[in-house]
Design a protein with these regions (language model features):
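Positively charged N-terminal leader segments that act as targeting/secretion signals
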Residues: 1-7
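Mixed-charge, Lys/Arg-enriched low-complexity segments
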Residues: 8-10, 14, 18-26, 105-152
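Negatively charged, low-complexity tracts enriched in Asp/Glu with abundant Ser/Thr
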Residues: 14, 18-79
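Eukaryotic intrinsically disordered, low-complexity regulatory linkers and tails enriched in Ser/Thr/Pro
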Residues: 72-74, 86-89, 95
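Short, surface-exposed coil-to-beta transition loops
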Residues: 80-85
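Short, surface-exposed beta-strand/strand-loop-strand elements in extracellular ectodomains
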Residues: 92-105
Length: 152
């Protein structure tokens, strides 16, 4: 289970592990954010109902060892998921891990080995579209909001 963004994420709660430097975390999360907005259209990000964006670090046990990872946390309210979406950079393998954590702290979905240019599509699938096709999604949006969706 991942901690809520407001909770203490300091690794001093875990013996034998050093927290990442604040500047490093900020730099990594800034890169995550830039990669997300440069590879994902604004209307897609807007559909997630983002209400807050937080910089943090999370601790993940991988093969018995604890690792701190810088993470971008988006609080979202989409069709498929509402809660916190963590995009954490796994420096050991140069890929991202994405976690969807409900407001009760329970992990709903997890993806690993996500490339930078896949972050937006993975988040969109988790938060908004699920397994719907584009046509099914447009029909659901049309019915839900009484709108006609036009794909250009």
């Amino acid at each position: 289970m991942l901690p809520h963004p407001g909770a203490c994420h300091c690794s001093n709660t875990i013996n034998e592990m050093k927290a990442l430097e604040k500047e490093h975390v900020m730099s990594v999360v800034n890169t995550i954010f830039k990669q997300l907005v440069s590879t994902t259209s604004a209307d897609v990000i807007g559909s997630w109902g983002v209400s807050s964006i937080v910089t943090t670090q999370i601790v993940q046990n991988i093969n018995g060892d604890n690792y701190a990872m810088a993470a971008l946390v988006l609080t979202v309210d989409g069709l498929q998921f509402s809660g916190d979406a963590y995009v954490a950079y796994d420096e050991g393998n140069d890929y991202y891990r994405i976690y969807a954590v409900k407001s009760d702290g329970k992990l709903q979905e997890y993806r690993k080995d996500v490339a930078f240019d896949e972050i937006g599509s993975v988040l969109d699938q988790m938060i908004e579209k699920g397994s719907m096709t584009q046509q099914e999604y447009e029909e659901k949006i049309s019915a839900l909001y009484n709108l006609k969706v036009i794909t250009l």
